[in-house]
Amino acid sequence: VSNGPASGQNDGARCANAPVVDEDSNIDFGDAPDSYLTLLASNGPRHELDGITWLGTTPPDADLDGYVTPQSDETVGVDDEWANGGIGFVTALEAGLDSKVVIEASTTGYLSAWIDWNQDGSFDGANEQVFTDYQLDAGENDLFLNVDINALTGTTWARFRFSQQTNLSYFGG
């Protein structure tokens, strides 16, 4: 017998472990395999959309959770993370050298970024945080990052977080 109150997201049944799903999410999540702590269940990176703060030319769309494959959240046809993501690697990433990155910011704010140099599926390795609370101006910003001397050759993942707050981690809200 169901005797709980019904709502727009609840049929009235009392389920102790029922997830709360906000179909009107105003939150943007990160995109990467979950070994990088991407999903909400893994305390994945997320921020509330403020209509002011983002990287690139297009404001991000809201997500219900993190996405673990490239472009997997683009079912609505808004390419906010990829083509207009605001991050351009101008020079090659070569171990032990500096690499130029152009970051386009919608407003002033703080950038923190990680690159999985050792390709172990996490961002917690030595020297994997490449920017920490780097203050960006609105528009294009030319930055240089040092590629770790022990960086492995091949495809890897990166996470860039831009916020009005400092001290952000590669995971968490």
Briefly describe each language-model feature range.
Residues 22-173:
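A broad "non-catalytic interaction surface" signal
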Residues 2-22:
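Blade-level signature of beta-propeller repeat domains, shared across WD40, Kelch, NHL, RCC1
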